[in-house]
Amino acid sequence: WHDFYHLPEYVRLCATHEGGVPMAFWAQCRDASFLAPMILRPLPASLNASPDWCDCVSPYGYSTPLVAPTQEQLPAFLEAVVGLAQERNVVAAFFRLHPFWELNKGDLCRFGKMVHHGQTIYLDLSVTQDEFWKQVRRNHKQNYQRLVQDGFEVSIDDWAHLAAFTAIYRDTMQRVGAASCLYSEQYFIDLKSILGSSMHLCCVHSRTGAVVAGGVFVEMGGLVHYHLSATANDCLRFGPNKLLIPAMRAWSQGRMNRVLHLGGGVGGAYDSLFHFKAGFSDAQADFYSYRLIVDQSKYESLSRMAATPAGEEQSISTNFFPAYRRPVPSASQLPPVSVGTTVAHDPGVEA
């Protein structure tokens, strides 16, 4: 089993847009195999580290390490990952784990640290339409009915609307301050080229036919992921995105998928985005990251010497990972974004 986050072409696309070199940790032991797609990053110039030093992060999304056919050899694989990473002067590695692919926590914690970021929301597609609507929050239902009455409609896989979706997507990312996800239309064209018939565009149209909300969904192995979404600034008060989920639930169920995964809040936070998604389903899954310090001495040195505006040493953060990449604002800047937010959009790395 694998998800679209593990496709080599997807990892390369992420590396291009997020910065870094696409690579993967791959190993075999007896009849078992291990794969962890990553993006290798140079360290920030402000650290004055050796040019040979680097770190790595998994590509955007739930690109968890895969091990098959069983996890019996997971400790041996993790030991091999650490050994190879040390040879390549990798200081630290950050992995995003998959909510529906659980790795043995005991084995993981022997080598690194698991961090629970919160819950993700999903829809069990085995339930009937009536059972689904019983779970939907009352104000979501009311808003949905009002949108239908006002003539809003949904289209699925009409790619003539990609440019319009991209425009409102970029406006949305600027509105919420997610500069690292400010993808161009070419990104979506490239993503479609990679994923082919697995990628789907769902758009909400006003009575005039204008695209006022939309989402990119990816279907693979019985899972449908709500990957990226947007709402037009001048239509926020109408909540047109409340039409997306019921439409894609019915569509996904009709194609015999098992789960429609909506994801969680920004960085796993229990924020307004999480609240919106939780209004459609009671079903939740845990979202973890896995943090691996490959070279403790280098990691501590870099974390202590991470530059501050005043040129003073910075204490090692126990939350942000890696600590030496923690944003440090100048006196004239706003406070840094939350740890969860940054982790969610931290570019992935493959090594």
For the regions a language model picked out, list residue spans one by one.
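A conserved beta-strand-loop-helix scaffold within acyl/acetyltransferase catalytic domains
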Residues: 1-47, 97-237, 350
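Short, high-confidence coil segments that cap the C-terminus of an alpha-helix
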Residues: 20-22, 87-90, 255-257
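Aromatic (often tryptophan-rich) hydrophobic motifs at membrane interfaces
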Residues: 26, 44, 79, 187-303
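Active-site/acyl-donor-binding loops of N-acyltransferases
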Residues: 39-42, 106-131, 255-351
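Conserved acyl-donor/pantetheine-binding loop and adjacent beta-alpha core of acyl/acetyltransferases
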Residues: 40-62
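A gly/proline- and charged-residue-enriched helix-loop-helix capping module
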Residues: 56-103
